[in-house]
Curated annotation (Swiss-Prot):
Gene3D superfamilies: Homeodomain-like. Belongs to the Abd-B homeobox family. It comes from the Eukaryota. Keywords: Developmental protein, DNA-binding, Homeobox, Nucleus, Transcription, Transcription regulation. Residues 209-221 have a biased composition (Polar residues). This is Homeobox protein Hox-D10a.
Amino acid sequence: MSFPSSSPAANTFLVDSLISACRTDSFYTGSSMYMPPGSEMGTYGMQTCGLLPAFSKRGEVNHQNVGMNVHSYIPQIDNWTDPSRPCRIESSNQDVQTTHSHQNIKEESNCCMYSDKRVPKVSSSEVPVYSNVAPESCPVDGPEIPVPGYFRLSQTYATGKHQEPYCHDPPDQSPTLIQLTPKPQPAPASATFADGESEKNKVPPEPATSRTPIQVESPKSATVEKICSPEASASSPELLQKEGKDSKSDQPANNWLTAKSGRKKRCPYTKHQTLELEKEFLFNMYLTRERRLEISRSVNLTDRQVKIWFQNRRMKLKKMSRENRIRELTSNLTFS
């Protein structure tokens, strides 16, 4: 901020007193002070304190040449808004009198405060010191109060207040020009929609062509597997066991893989495996570990499976022998 050398505002004490007067909502009671014209002082801080006029409204006379007379007080902060918001000062025909009563001062120093929604939008970098200044006479929740003698907001603020993404239009543009400007967005949107419909029409025939050979090949592969499976089952017992598990529904109820109730047996051994194990059981009911390993290799089973089979076979033999013994005893008692 530059001041002329002859001006008393160059003194730091006077500048500090001006700032403190704005902070504490009190009035400056100096006898006289020289105020330079608006062309020399263009800063925002001094403008809002009442030393300079605000931005003039479009179409009105510029107030830069109008100088301020000697004041006996510094008015209170009237408006804290964005520097680019259009405001105007009502010009009065009579000059400001050197003597004012406190009532007139309070009436003229009414401010135009905004609701809580508008206050945070003033950037802290622009107004770091005076952001919390608010007089008691100005309600916060209510609507804006027009000022009788100083700043008044133009009607452009009332229309743009309710727009959440708040932005200032450049001064050159007018609402008529904005309405007449063409909008090129609907044309590409319709073009993309037409392209999407054409692509949807082209896509369905492709899966149909890809599915048809799969359906033709699937029965061939199934027949090949059915032809190969009997040949392999005749050679190896493992495939026989797997084939017996897979073809459960095709087998009759009296088959050796299923029980009388129709459920699948717990350990469905093949005929070849059961025959070899039965022969070994008739020859020797209790196997050594070496003999059990040999049988497991020959029958293509594990050592544990052979061991469990012999245990179950012994329990079955014991049960059968007990039933036969009871039957013999009962038959002997009846005839005697």
